[in-house]
């Protein structure tokens, strides 16, 4: 919701009074990970976008706001064509994508068409380069900030030098965040398993989980992951008999983690970083309580 509100502020000068009786339609694109590793969060993202469209309609009654949703797939190969579909649909601006690689691919299409985009979740540090990614904005901090914050979190939790392993996907989000965490923590202060890199499509983590269980030094692990892979890793660690402290970034921080787990009690004690509410958070909590389904957003 906050992302769309920021778009409204950006377009406020363009959305002044309209002398025509017929309302002008303003199309806003929305790149949502309907498929892929962040799919469990897609319903929440969509609900928030719909609520924001309702707010915009109240703020600017002379306009009809239309949300055009496309699947980003949490994948550049999906998000690029989706962005072109939004361009062809005549959108003024785009909200998204969630995943960094998807935002990078979409930006190449959208910026070429002169369409700005604002992401609600893409944190790769490289996206801060305005020359490489023109007309890209985000309302979440870069992993250049989240990485050191994660290191501080683990220090405060009592993780000792030489006790931490870092698991990270090799995609734009996972590698960027894992790099930031290792840089802040110190590569020479990792445990004997060290850093483990894997493809986001990997589904078998039993071998690395067995290494963690056999280690005499690895009492903590940081997951630079999404939801689906984090669940598989956590379950593999439990199956191997490892019972240390699990940490993570914003990727596995959503409530979708509970739906993905076969045994959500394994999440007890897991500690993650996540951007806090900003000064423009407004009355979101009250808005959610008044409008969200009683059984939660599914």
Please state what every model-predicted region is.
Residues 1-25:
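Secretory targeting signatures
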Residues 19-30, 59-64, 155-162:
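Immediate post-signal peptide segment of exported/extracytoplasmic ligand-binding proteins
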Residues 23-25, 40-47, 54-130, 139, ...:
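Beta-alpha junction/loop-to-helix N-cap segments that form part of ligand/metal-binding clefts
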Residues 31-34, 70-73, 96-100, 120-123, ...:
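Active-site-proximal beta-strand/loop segments in catalytic clefts of secreted hydrolases
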Residues 35-47, 172-176:
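Glycine- and acidic-residue-enriched helix-capping/strand-helix junction motifs
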Residues 81, 125-126, 134-241, 279, ...:
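Extracellular/periplasmic Venus flytrap/periplasmic-binding protein
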Residues 86-98, 118-120, 163-168, 193, ...:
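Periplasmic-binding protein-like
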Residues 234-298:
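Extracellular/periplasmic periplasmic-binding protein-like sensory domains
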């Amino acid at each position: 919701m906050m992302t769309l509100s920021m778009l409204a502020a950006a377009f406020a000068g363009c959305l002044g009074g309209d002398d025509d009786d017929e309302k002008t339609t303003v199309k806003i694109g929305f790149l949502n990970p309907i498929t892929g590793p962040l799919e469990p969060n897609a319903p929440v993202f969509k609900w928030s976008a719909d609520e924001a469209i309702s707010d915009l309609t109240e703020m600017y009654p002379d306009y009809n706001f239309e949300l055009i949703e496309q699947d980003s797939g949490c994948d550049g190969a999906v998000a690029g064509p989706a962005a072109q579909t939004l361009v062809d649909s005549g959108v003024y601006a785009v909200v998204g994508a969630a995943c960094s690689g998807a935002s990078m691919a979409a930006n190449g299409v959208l910026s070429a068409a002169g369409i700005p985009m604002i992401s609600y979740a893409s944190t790769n540090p490289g996206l801060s380069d305005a020359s490489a990614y023109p007309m890209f904005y985000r309302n979440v901090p870069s992993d250049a900030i989240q990485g050191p914050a994660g290191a501080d979190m683990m220090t405060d939790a009592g993780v000792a030098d030489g006790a931490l392993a870092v698991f990270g996907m090799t995609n734009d989000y996972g590698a960027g965040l894992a790099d930031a965490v290792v840089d802040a923590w110190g590569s020479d202060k990792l445990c004997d398993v060290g850093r483990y890199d894997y493809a986001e499509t990997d589904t078998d983590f039993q071998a690395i989980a067995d290494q963690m269980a056999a280690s005499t030094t690895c009492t903590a692990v940081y997951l630079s992951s999404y939801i689906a892979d984090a669940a598989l890793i956590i379950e593999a660690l439990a199956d191997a008999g490892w019972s240390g402290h699990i940490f993570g970034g914003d990727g596995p921080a959503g409530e979708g983690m509970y739906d993905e787990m076969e045994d959500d009690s394994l999440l007890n004690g897991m500690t993650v970083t996540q951007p806090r509410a900003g000064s423009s958070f407004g009355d979101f909590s009250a808005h959610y309580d008044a409008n969200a389904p009683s059984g939660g957003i599914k």
